[in-house]
């Protein structure tokens, strides 16, 4: 292999094809990773990488807080080694459980991206990304830092507003939390 070939991805078209455009978090994510190589290529591994963003938008009276953060990347192997020839059409099917990215309150939205990856030793990975709509549940914590008891719910389709363990008003807990976050954000230096 030439020195410069190590820095270039193999000449292979890759596509992540999901069977559905929308899923519930309890569903199996099904589909296939499709390769159409323009050169002979040895794939070491097929995997799916889940990531994305979590967006918080809270407003109470004259106070508001918005924040976006990255979700933890979760890598799930879905297949092993395969050698594909130039001009050969190859499809690698998969069926996996969707990793859980729960929403902690009614002010948080989760957007997930799924990347199909084919790794080639010594060369850049082949990747293709899709953004399925995945309905994630609420997992609500009665946060001790803001006057709660620490109880955490099982996954729920709708957010609860009262802690099932201590009866604490969770809206008040969230308001304390996001009011404090908004004050801290206002104190931070602004970057332009």
Language-model features, listed with the residues they occupy:
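C-terminal beta-sandwich interaction modules and adjacent acidic
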Residues: 1-192
């Amino acid at each position: 292999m030439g020195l410069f070939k190590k820095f270039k991805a193999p000449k292979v078209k890759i596509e992540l094809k999901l069977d559905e455009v929308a899923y519930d978090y309890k569903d199996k994510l099904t589909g296939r990773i499709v390769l159409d190589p323009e050169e002979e290529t040895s794939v070491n591994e097929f995997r799916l990488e889940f990531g994305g963003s979590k967006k918080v938008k809270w407003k109470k009276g004259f106070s508001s807080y918005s924040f976006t953060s990255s979700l933890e990347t979760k890598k799930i192997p879905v297949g092993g080694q395969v050698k594909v020839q130039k001009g050969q059409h190859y499809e690698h099917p998969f069926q996996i459980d969707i990793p859980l990215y729960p929403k902690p309150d009614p002010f948080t939205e989760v957007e997930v991206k799924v990347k199909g990856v084919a790794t080639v030793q010594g060369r850049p990975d082949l990747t293709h990304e899709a953004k399925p709509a995945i309905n994630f549940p609420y997992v609500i914590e009665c946060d001790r830092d803001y006057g709660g008891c620490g109880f955490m719910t099982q996954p729920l389709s709708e957010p609860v507003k009262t802690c099932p363990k201590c009866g604490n008003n969770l809206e008040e807990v969230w308001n304390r939390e996001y009011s404090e976050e908004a004050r801290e954000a206002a104190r931070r230096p602004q970057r332009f």
